[in-house]
């Protein structure tokens, strides 16, 4: 089991921006968040990497009173885990469990190795 705490993830709706020519690019907000989250993850997970299938549990503290979709936070969190090298690829995620919590870190990620390929 690996446990990391990261900044509150951006919503899926905030990850990408469209150009006038029809292209897409990562939003500056997402780029900044992903770099900060990847550094935080790498600092906390020096001893572990998961190469194969895994379960992700997310415990998220809402930053304010706005209504949010919890499922919009998965992609950015998984991308940060992959960028930090903690998981080989987010396609190996076999099970996601997530819930809002009252207190704690903005976002706590708990990874359970389902394949026994933990280094």
Predicted features along the sequence, with ranges:
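Acidic, proline/glycine-enriched N-terminal capping motif
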Residues: 1-119
């Amino acid at each position: 089991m690996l446990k990391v705490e990261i900044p509150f993830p951006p919503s899926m709706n905030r990850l990408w921006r469209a150009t006038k020519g029809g292209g897409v690019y990562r939003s500056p907000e997402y780029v900044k968040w992903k770099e900060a989250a990847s550094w935080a993850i790498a600092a906390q997970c020096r001893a572990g990497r998961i190469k194969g299938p895994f379960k992700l549990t997310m415990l998220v503290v809402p930053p304010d009173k706005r209504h949010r979709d919890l499922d919009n936070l998965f992609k950015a969190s998984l991308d940060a885990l992959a960028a930090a090298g903690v998981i080989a690829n987010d396609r190996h995620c076999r099970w996601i469990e997530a819930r809002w919590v009252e207190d704690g870190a903005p976002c706590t990620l708990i990874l359970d190795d389902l394949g026994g390929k933990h280094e």
